[in-house]
Amino acid sequence: MFAVMKTGGKQYKVQAGDKLRVELLAAEAGEAVQFNEILMLGGDNVTVGAPLVEGAAVQANVIEQVKGAKLIHYVKRRRKHSSQRKKGHRQKLTLIEITDILASGGDKSGMKTAIGAGMVAVAAGAVATAAVVATKAAKKAKDAKDEAPKAAPKAEKKKAAPKKAKAEAAPAAADEGTRPANLLDAARDGKADDLKKISGVGPKLEGLLNENGVYHFDQIMAWGPSEIAYMDDKLSFKGRIERDNWIEQATAFAAEQE
C-alpha cells in the first residue's frame, strides 16, 4: 500500500519503511508525527482525494534534522585558471521514516500533526505583532486619558476670554469720543466756509466734512478733545485733526472772517 502525501509545498509517494527528507518540521529527533494531507491512496483499491482523502494519514518517526548537500561549482578555464567554490543555499531538512499508512481514522489517532517550522515561525510572528499592536493601543489610550484633565483648564481659559474682551471693549468705546453738538444739516445762509484753507484739506475731504455736518471754521474751533476723537474716528482721519492743528487754523480763519 502506498500514499501520496503533501508537506512543505511538495508531494511525496511513500510506503511503510521509506526514509525521505522533507522540508524542516517543527519536531525533535525521535518524535512521532502524522501527515494529514493525503492526496491519494494506492494498493488493492485506489482512492483519489478531492482534493484530500478524508480520514487518511501517514505516520512517521523523525530521525534527525539535517541540511542539504554542499554543492561545488566548478568553472573550467584555459591554462590552469579553472576555479571551484561552494555554491548555493543549504536547505534545512528533516529526515523521517514512514511507519504506517492509515486509510481511515487518522483524524482520531491523537498523534502530533507534522507542521513546517516556517509555519510555526509565521504564527509566532503574528502573535508577537498582535501583542505589540495591543500594547501600543493600550498605551495610547492611557496617554489620552492622562491628557484629558490637562485639557480642562484650557477650556476654562477660553470661557474667560469673553470677559476680557468685554473689559477691552469698554475703553475702546470711551476712546470713540462724543458727537459734536454743533454739527449742521446745511451751511448757514446757504454759504459754507472754504475749508480747503486748512492744511491737508482738499476738495474731497471738504466734501466729506460737509456730508458729516461741518461747514464753518467756528464749528471746528469749538471742538474739545472728546469731539475731536469722535470726528477723527468717524472720518478715519487717524489723528490728522490734532497732527495738523486744525483747531488753531480754524480759529485763525474764523477771526479773519470777522
From Swiss-Prot:
Name the domain of life. Bacteria
InterPro entries, alphabetically?
A: bL21-like, bL21-like_sf, Ribosomal_bL21
Listed GO cellular component terms?
A: cytoplasm; ribonucleoprotein complex; ribosome
Instruction: Locate the compositionally biased regions of type Basic and acidic residues.
Output: 140-159
Any GO molecular function: structural constituent of ribosome
Coiled-coil residue spans? none
Q: List keywords of the entry alphabetically.
A: Ribonucleoprotein, Ribosomal protein, RNA-binding, rRNA-binding
Q: Where are the transmembrane segments?
A: none
Instruction: Name a single GO biological process.
Output: translation
Annotated region (Disordered) at 140-181
User: NCBIfam families, per this entry?
Assistant: L21, PRK12278.1-1
Which family is this sequence assigned to? Belongs to the bacterial ribosomal protein bL21 family.
State the oligomer form and interacting partners: Part of the 50S ribosomal subunit. Contacts protein L20.
UniProt function note: This protein binds to 23S rRNA in the presence of protein L20.
PANTHER family, alphabetically?
Answer: 50S RIBOSOMAL PROTEIN L21, LARGE RIBOSOMAL SUBUNIT PROTEIN BL21M
The identity of this protein, by name, is Large ribosomal subunit protein bL21
Higher taxonomy: Bacteria, Pseudomonadati, Pseudomonadota, Alphaproteobacteria, Rhodobacterales
